[in-house]
């Protein structure tokens, strides 16, 4: 089977990371709202579990995650727009990095906008390079695993009682990535 140029670059990227020559981070946004996504629950016989869905606020989260569980995240009560993403990247890389850092992003409109493209040269001067995933490949973006873990495993039903409590729980998890909350990526197959 012939491998595409993108697959070869993807493979080289991880070889460079394994050699310690670059740092690779995966970036993405997700939303958390009061309607829980708990797919199943266990209870004792004759015990009833109730989760009352409520319409409440939505907490938007944008962040970067490495395979070593190093994360940098930002939250907003507004939708994530290009300006927000650019400001986050600028805050994350305020000056030239010693070791090159590759930021892997999906092809969302926010990531492909003119503003994002206009910033790439300045970021590259700081040793930050943006790598876009192939289209329709969200499974390759490791931070998607973080969002799933948060929504399906780490958030508890009682965290959805109020928007304030949900916000607090989400921020607690985000602050604990790498210490209390870890994902094992070493066995993951990428291609």
Predicted regions and their residues:
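Short functional hotspots at interaction and active-site rims
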Residues: 1-191
């Amino acid at each position: 089977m012939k491998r595409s140029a993108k697959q070869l670059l993807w493979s080289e990227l991880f070889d460079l990371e394994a050699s310690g020559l670059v740092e690779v981070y995966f970036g993405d946004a997700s939303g958390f709202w009061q309607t829980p996504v708990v797919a199943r629950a266990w209870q004792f016989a004759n015990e009833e579990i109730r989760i009352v869905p409520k319409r409440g606020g939505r907490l938007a989260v944008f962040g970067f995650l490495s395979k070593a569980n190093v994360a940098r995240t930002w939250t907003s009560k507004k939708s994530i727009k290009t300006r927000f993403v650019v400001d986050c990247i600028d805050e994350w890389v305020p000056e030239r990095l010693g070791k090159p850092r590759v930021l892997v992003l999906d092809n969302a409109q926010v990531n492909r906008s003119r503003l994002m493209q206009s910033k790439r040269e300045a970021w590259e001067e700081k040793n930050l390079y943006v790598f876009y995933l192939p289209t329709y490949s969200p499974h390759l973006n490791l931070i998607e695993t973080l969002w799933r873990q948060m929504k399906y495993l780490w958030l508890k039903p009682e965290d959805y009682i109020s928007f304030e409590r949900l916000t607090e729980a989400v921020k607690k998890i985000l602050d604990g990535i790498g210490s209390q909350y870890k994902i094992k990526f070493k066995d993951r197959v990428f291609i």
